[in-house]
């Protein structure tokens, strides 16, 4: 490896603001902010969504209608297809 070209890999605390959860992860992200957890100071980054708050991971998913787009089109505009102009 060449010296002085690789980013510094360190433990960083990511704060999921929507779930108010803190996650310690190894990262090369640059940040000026710091936070103290358990008597140790870590670099600190806020995020809006993580696995602690994303609906896919929490099980609070929206269910979508299984009706096809063609069927929805027919339902909305099907009466125009057979209509006479004039």
UniProtKB/Swiss-Prot annotation:
Which keywords does the record carry? Ribonucleoprotein, Ribosomal protein
Give the residues annotated as coiled coil.
none
Question: Which is a Pfam family this sequence falls into?
Answer: Ribosomal_L31
| Keyword Ribosomal protein part of the UniProt annotation | yes
GO biological process annotations for this chain's record?
A: translation
A cellular component term from Gene Ontology for this protein is: ribonucleoprotein complex
Example of a GO MF term = structural constituent of ribosome
Task: Answer yes or no on keyword Ribonucleoprotein.
Answer: yes
Q: How does it assemble?
A: Part of the 50S ribosomal subunit.
Q: Tell me which family the UniProt entry assigns to this protein.
A: Belongs to the bacterial ribosomal protein bL31 family. Type B subfamily.
Name of this chain's protein: Large ribosomal subunit protein bL31B
The gene name reads rpmE2
């Amino acid at each position: 490896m060449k010296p002085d070209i690789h980013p510094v890999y360190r433990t960083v605390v990511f704060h999921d603001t929507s779930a108010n959860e803190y996650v310690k992860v190894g990262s090369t992200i640059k940040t000026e902010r710091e936070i103290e957890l358990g008597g140790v100071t870590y670099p600190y980054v806020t995020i809006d969504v993580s696995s602690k708050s994303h609906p896919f991971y929490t099980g609070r998913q929206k269910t979508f209608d299984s009706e096809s787009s063609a069927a929805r089109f027919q339902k909305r505009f099907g009466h125009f297809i057979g209509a006479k102009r004039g």
